[in-house]
Design a protein with these regions (language model features):
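PAPS-dependent sulfotransferase catalytic domain
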Residues: 1-170
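PAPS-dependent sulfotransferases, especially Golgi type II membrane carbohydrate sulfotransferases
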Residues: 1-23, 27, 138-144, 158-161, ...
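PAPS/PAP-binding and catalytic site of the sulfotransferase fold
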Residues: 34-43, 167-194
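Short, solvent-exposed coil/turn linker segments
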Residues: 99, 171-174, 198, 220
Length: 249
């Protein structure tokens, strides 16, 4: 479960059955997964892997090897929603043209749009088909809106705390604010050796450039609109969000 102090500290580190030698980052799109992956990869002896499945999906690995550290990233829902609208990865054209208020309320739709992001599509096809990683993992149903997707994905992400593996749960904003403090806590928590090389910060934008599939896209608001806050609050699990340090007053 989420520690009571997480809202203040911004990270939680749970030891597993063995000292980790590799790690995989999980978290929804636009939640700092690339930043955290690069930060750990540059400044520890841990080797990054993607072998446990798509990092933005629900947990669907067959097993978690004892030497693999699972790193889970979360982000404030307001900033996250704005980023999802600004870069609507894997959304079909009809989603990409929606203005922000309609985008967050629309039935969530994504497709397997590019082979290079999905090994199965690369191997056996399926380009343009619904992205099953964004469907409900049990029922297969489409999520009614963006925040319903977040709520379910967050439940899946937090389930790693129950899976008997080594887990780091971290808030993107806190790690970005104090990356060296995060790394120090990581090394201590898992008895990892201190790197011989000096700290290497992350100074440039990470991730691929988003390429829209429509000629014109609506502008994303500079901040989360006040008139949409009641919808956000009604769609999220506010108790869980607050335990993660997110309040939407």
């Amino acid at each position: 479960m989420i520690e009571d102090r997480f809202a203040e500290t911004g990270w939680q580190m749970v030891r597993g059955p063995a000292r980790p030698v590799s790690f995989q980052v999980f978290g929804e799109r636009s939640s700092g997964t690339n930043f955290v992956k690069r930060l750990i990869g540059r400044n520890t002896g841990l080797t990054p892997t993607e072998d446990l499945g798509w990092k933005h999906g629900f947990p669907h690995m067959t097993a978690i090897p004892p030497q693999v550290l699972v790193v889970c990233c979360v982000r404030d829902a307001r900033a996250w929603a704005l980023s999802m609208h600004s870069k609507p990865w894997h959304c079909p054209p009809q989603m990409q043209v929606l203005p922000f208020p309609r985008f967050i309320r629309a039935e969530w739709a994504t497709i397997a749009d590019r082979k290079r992001y999905f090994p199965q599509v690369q191997a056996i096809g399926g380009v343009g088909q619904p992205l099953q990683h964004d469907r409900h993992p049990i029922t297969g149903q489409v999520f009614p809106n963006l925040f319903a997707l977040r709520r379910a994905k967050l439940s899946g992400l937090l389930s790693f705390l129950n899976r008997g593996c080594a887990v780091v749960l971290c808030r993107m904003e806190t790690v970005q604010h104090d990356p060296q403090g995060f790394l120090s806590a990581l090394l201590t928590a898992y008895d990892l050796p201190t790197p011989e090389k000096p700290y290497r910060p992350i100074v440039k934008r990470l991730g691929s450039k988003f390429l829209p599939s429509v000629d014109e896209r609506p502008q994303t608001p500079d901040s989360f609109p006040a008139e949409d806050l009641s919808f956000l609050r009604g769609a999220l699990d506010l108790e869980t969000e607050e335990r993660l340090g997110f309040r939407y007053d």
